[in-house]
Amino acid sequence: LFAALRLIEAGYRPVIVERGKNVRDRKLDLAKISREHKVDSESNYSFGEGGAGAYSDGKLYTRSKKRGNAEKILNVFCQHGASVSILQDAHPHIGTDKLPRVIENMRKTILDCGGEVHFGTRMDVLLIEKDTVVGIETNTGKTFRGPVILATGHSARDVYRWLHTHGVEIESKGLAVGVRLEHPSLLIDQIQYHNRNGRGKYLPAAEYSFVQQVEGRGVYSF
């Protein structure tokens, strides 16, 4: 979505090919996973408009030092319905209830500016000429040509197999494994505010994080 908006700024009319469904219809498929244990291989937590983070709690925070123009990203979210508070908060947070609407509004901007969005359309073949990707062929048999941005997320294994089979150089990336740790909010407030009574009536819940190096690897909370 952000790549498409950037292309629009540069005068292009981007075409988004999305193998999953739109952000609203995805909710029905996610409900089936929880209630009926039925998984749609093309519409689930990984595939669909907004990607794997569409139904997260919308935290907008990074420890990376290669952040780029983070302020511009936050402004785009605000322009499409996120609270302006994310521009000032140390740990900006859109919220699970608001994020799908923000994603829909971003799609509307793309369409209003002449872009296209095709749902239920999977890339099956990269069209390569003289070692340059010039387009894609989809599962519907339709071909799209022009500049291609391949944003596969982390679970499109069929894409990686295709790339490997056709000699495209790929390499593995570091994997972070998360576990959930819970601490009583009163305990954290007492520690962070240095007050045995916690935060009192007026202060917000205290923020905290843990960072440690174990055998040369970083362990951190997020």
Region annotations inferred by a language model:
Residues 1-222:
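Residues forming the flavin
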